[in-house]
Amino acid sequence: MVKGIFITATGTDIGKTYITALIVKKLREFNINCGYYKAALSGAERIDGKLIAGDANYVYNIADIKGDPNDAVSYIFEQAVSPHLAAKLNNVEISMEKIKKDFSYIKNKHDYITVEGSGGIICPISMGKEKIMLENIIKSFKLPAIVVADAGLGTINSTILTLQYIKEKNISVKMILLNNYNHEDIIHIENKRYLSDNLPIPVYTCNKNSNNLEIPAEKLIEYYEEI
């Protein structure tokens, strides 16, 4: 049985792709066949006339996954806007059926699958014929989540609000990961202490520009669930 997890965040440009890549890299270095999938990607780069799914390409490079990164993304858009707006601008109808089919294909090639979200947890994927929010994908895949948050000022508010929204949607959260953490920054230190003391889930940190997660692979795989 394949096991999976979903990586979401408190907002855009928090570092989901960076953290996702480090998680997949850690597991693959532990000889675990871990793959990657993303339903919709915006802000793709066009090279020689072809759109390149930058987030997937980054994860594939860091985690040493073979193959075409574009195969790990169902919908790829050039405009750096929300997926629902990108789809509208390109006259594309996003389909949950295609997302499920593509996810199933990628999932069945691996023992573990790490799914990256788009933007923060409240992200419209499609407002066309099908109304699809990010949480619809998470629940459809039956995945627990990891929430990536910035370690700096304001993260207590954004993290707790994100967790409240996720709880309302009946999605399980396994841990919080504070990105861009500085062990000498009093704000970062206090944010971690407060969240650790007031949340029922573990709070981990990742130093800025780190090439490795300090979380052991054995601990990471405990957060993945059978899907």
UniProtKB/Swiss-Prot annotation:
Q: Which cofactor does it need?
A: Mg(2+)
* UniProt signal peptide: none
Q: Which controlled-vocabulary keywords does the entry list?
A: ATP-binding, Biotin biosynthesis, Cytoplasm, Ligase, Magnesium, Metal-binding, Nucleotide-binding
Name the major location: cytoplasm
State the pathway, as annotated in the record.
Answer: Cofactor biosynthesis; biotin biosynthesis; biotin from 7,8-diaminononanoate: step 1/2
Give the first-level EC class, as a single word. ligase
Active-site residues, record numbering mapped to chain? 38
Q: Where does substrate bind?
A: 42
Q: Which residues form a coiled coil?
A: none
Enumerate the residues binding ATP.
13-18, 55, 116-119, 179-180
**GO MF annotation, one:** dethiobiotin synthase activity
Question: Localized where?
Answer: Cytoplasm
One GO location term (cellular component): cytosol
Where do the annotations place Mg(2+) binding? 17, 55, 116
For this chain, the family text in UniProt reads: Belongs to the dethiobiotin synthetase family.
Q: How does it assemble?
A: Homodimer.
Q: What does the record give as the function of this protein?
A: Catalyzes a mechanistically unusual reaction, the ATP-dependent insertion of CO2 between the N7 and N8 nitrogen atoms of 7,8-diaminopelargonic acid (DAPA, also called 7,8-diammoniononanoate) to form a ureido ring.
* Protein name listed in UniProt: ATP-dependent dethiobiotin synthetase BioD
